[in-house]
Design a protein with these regions (language model features):
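Conserved nucleotide-sugar phosphate-binding/catalytic loop shared by glycosyltransferases and other
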Residues: 3-8, 30-76, 222-224, 309
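Donor-nucleotide binding loops and adjacent catalytic segments primarily
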Residues: 41, 46, 50, 172-258, ...
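Active-site-proximal region of nucleotide-activated glycan assembly enzymes
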Residues: 42, 53, 112-173
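Glycosyltransferases and closely related glycan-assembly transferases
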Residues: 83-96, 103-119, 132-137
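Acidic donor-binding loop of glycosyltransferase active sites
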Residues: 93-95, 253-268, 275-276
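C-terminal "capping" alpha-helix adjacent to the active site of nucleotide-linked donor transferases
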Residues: 304-307, 311-328
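A short, well-ordered alpha-helix in the C-terminal region of glycosyltransferases
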Residues: 329-343
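C-terminal alpha-helical cap of glycosyltransferases
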Residues: 342-359
Length: 359
């Protein structure tokens, strides 16, 4: 069986695609997988390290980019379709899976027009415009949140959860504070988040009284790396500051508390790992979908949400201290978080895809 996985750009789209690719190969090493992404995304760096093939197309987002850049992106759409047709014709897949991201639209539509089976994996509680359009044409749509059902025809929809790589389902740690340290994992998605980086630096002075009991692992992204690293060094904090964490599953397992954005894949990884989190939704996400994602965990008692506009170094430090002083609260949040995790999402999607192709 030959499968194209189209999309990416950020880890939120790419890593669910990798989870599906790994599940296909777990079933049969003879399955062939090809990713379609963009040159500007993180696909090339990540996929090459995992041994997956990648072809790129030239496509950019349209919404929220200003009149001139939106017009340029619109004019480039025909080229992205031509590139997609060429790649699909040469690879001759049995199935094309759209996982979101700019490359997903042209590749999935091209495959549909070529008579190839197509499916979507929608990670967010609120689907983006591209997936709402694609949903009219694809054969199946796999959802992570029940709130998303209303956007797609019910006969196409399956509630599977967001596919997550199996490493996130490792046995959870039973010790809240390994070696007496309370470990924070701070990240803003695969590319970092400037606002979270700055707020975390502002919190350091307020956290100094618990410096000897605290360890911080902070994924900054490449742009802020040196500035944030210097700030931690000046504070004397026990901190590991990295531009990108390749083995995020291990980082999750080592953490007592996560501080992060509320992208759909981060939400799925949090629940897969059964972790407590302070969620800071990206306020400029399309149609505020990160807030909607975060609210799912907040309602379940698995996370706290702090809007970015309400955040300060003092407030974040107070929240961290509060969780440190209430280990039983963290345990409760972890249990509720784990209760939301779906360990079988990738397997369920692959099962459905194989039935679809064989039909």
């Amino acid at each position: 069986m030959k499968v194209i996985i189209a999309g990416g750009g950020t880890g939120g789209h790419l890593f669910p695609g990798i989870a599906l690719a790994e599940e296909f190969l777990r079933r049969n090493r003879d399955h062939r997988i090809l990713f379609i992404g963009t040159k500007k995304g993180m696909e090339a760096k990540v996929l090459s390290g995992l041994g997956f093939a990648l072809q790129t197309i030239d496509v950019e987002g349209i919404k929220g980019r200003g009149l001139i850049r939106s017009a340029e992106a619109l004019l480039g759409i025909p080229k992205s379709f031509i590139q997609s047709f060429r790649i699909i014709r040469l690879f001759s897949p049995d199935l094309v899976i759209g996982v979101g991201g700019y490359a997903s639209g042209p590749a999935v539509m091209a495959a549909h027009w070529m008579g190839i089976r197509t499916v979507l994996a929608e990670q967010n509680a609120l689907p983006g415009l591209t997936n709402r359009i694609l949903g009219r044409f694809v054969d199946r749509v796999f959802l992570s949140f029940s709130e998303t059902k209303k956007w797609f025809r019910k006969e196409k929809v399956s509630m599977t959860g967001n596919p997550i790589r199996t490493r996130f389902f490792m046995e959870k740690k039973n010790i809240l504070r390994p070696q007496g340290l309370f470990t924070l994992l701070v990240f803003g998605g695969s590319q970092g988040a400037h606002a979270i980086n700055q707020i975390m630096v502002a919190a350091l002075d307020h956290l100094k009284p618990m410096k000897s009991r605290l360890k911080i692992v902070h994924q900054t992204g490449s742009k802020d790396l040196e500035e944030i690293r210097r700030a931690y060094q000046a504070s004397g904090m026990n901190a590991e500051v990295l531009p990108f964490i390749m083995d995020m599953a291990s980082a999750y397992q080592s953490a007592d508390l996560l501080i992060c954005r509320a992208g759909a894949t981060s939400i799925a990884e949090i629940t897969a790992s059964g972790k407590a989190a302070i969620l800071i939704p990206f306020p400029y996400a399309v149609e505020d979908h990160q807030t909607k994602n975060a609210e799912v965990l907040v309602r379940a008692g698995a996370a706290e949400m702090i809007p970015e506009k309400e955040l300060s170094g003092q407030r974040l430090a107070d929240a961290i201290k509060g969780y440190y002083e209430q280990p039983e609260l963290i345990r409760q949040m972890e249990e509720r978080s784990a209760g939301l995790g779906n360990v079988g999402a990738a397997a369920d999607i692959v099962d459905a895809c194989m039935i679809l192709v064989d039909a």
